[in-house]
């Protein structure tokens, strides 16, 4: 992780400067980063999805979240979260959602070091970012697990691959890959923030997403 952080630049302008709650009327700020200088490994979307290992386990439509909070979705953003749960892996969160224990909360993917579980179809909204605001209405939500016994680096890398795949499938620019912080000011995803705000760690994650996007798209970037 330290090696990757060293190649990243400061976030300019820092996301925190323009990411106050309800800032959806503005375009997300560009995140400055240095593209990772490692050889590209060409992949197709199908190949990278197999690497991510996406297991579908959709929430029942009878749950409160699906009945009242899961309208139609045309994705424009990808919102990155972390679970803040040191003991729950992706399957644990799937069971939690499927039993309706989350109340109104629902999101699209939970990622751990081994796989990603998909909880919602990608044409249905989640309820995860800003209480029904634009973060919910227009974004795909990815939750990253924080299991103590898991490798953080593997979890982040799997999430970066998934993000790059979704960017490619839905023509979403890197600029529109945002932390939960962008929508609500919440310090989330906590492990990828610096002093509860986007900084070097978030810049590193964005550089990783950019690397996998270039692997999928013949070396081309889609920043803005």
Model-inferred region functions:
Residues 1-4:
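Positively charged n-region of N-terminal signal peptides that target proteins for export
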Residues 135, 140-149:
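Cell-envelope and extracellular/periplasmic
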Residues 132-138, 206-208:
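A structural motif
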Residues 19-131, 135:
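N-terminal catalytic cores of peptidoglycan-degrading enzymes
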Residues 6-17:
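Hydrophobic helical h-region of N-terminal Sec-dependent signal peptides
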Residues 79, 108, 141-143, 178:
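Soluble periplasmic/extracytoplasmic beta-strand elements of cell-envelope proteins
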Residues 19-56, 148-224:
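Basic/polar, cationic surfaces and motifs that engage anionic cell-wall
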């Amino acid at each position: 992780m330290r090696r990757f952080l060293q190649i990243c630049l400061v976030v300019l302008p820092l996301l925190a400067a323009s990411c106050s709650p309800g800032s959806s009327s503005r375009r997300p700020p560009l995140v400055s980063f240095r593209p990772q200088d490692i050889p590209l490994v060409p992949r197709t979307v199908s190949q990278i999805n197999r690497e991510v290992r996406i297991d579908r386990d959709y929430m029942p439509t009878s749950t409160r979240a699906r009945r009242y909070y899961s309208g139609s979705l045309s994705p424009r953003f990808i919102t990155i979260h972390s679970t803040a749960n040191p003991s729950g892996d992706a399957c644990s969160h799937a069971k939690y959602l499927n039993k309706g224990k989350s109340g109104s909360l629902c999101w699209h993917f939970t990622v751990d070091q081994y796989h990603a579980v998909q909880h919602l179809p990608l044409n249905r909204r989640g309820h995860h970012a800003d209480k029904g605001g634009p973060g919910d209405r227009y974004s795909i939500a990815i939750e990253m697990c924080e299991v103590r016994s898991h490798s953080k680096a593997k979890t982040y890398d799997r999430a970066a691959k998934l993000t790059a795949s979704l960017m490619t499938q839905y023509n979403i620019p890197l600029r529109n890959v945002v932390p939960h912080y962008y929508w609500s000011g919440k310090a989330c995803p906590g492990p990828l923030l610096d002093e509860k705000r986007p900084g070097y760690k978030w810049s590193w994650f964005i550089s990783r997403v950019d690397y996998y996007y270039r692997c999928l798209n013949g070396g081309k970037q889609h920043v803005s």
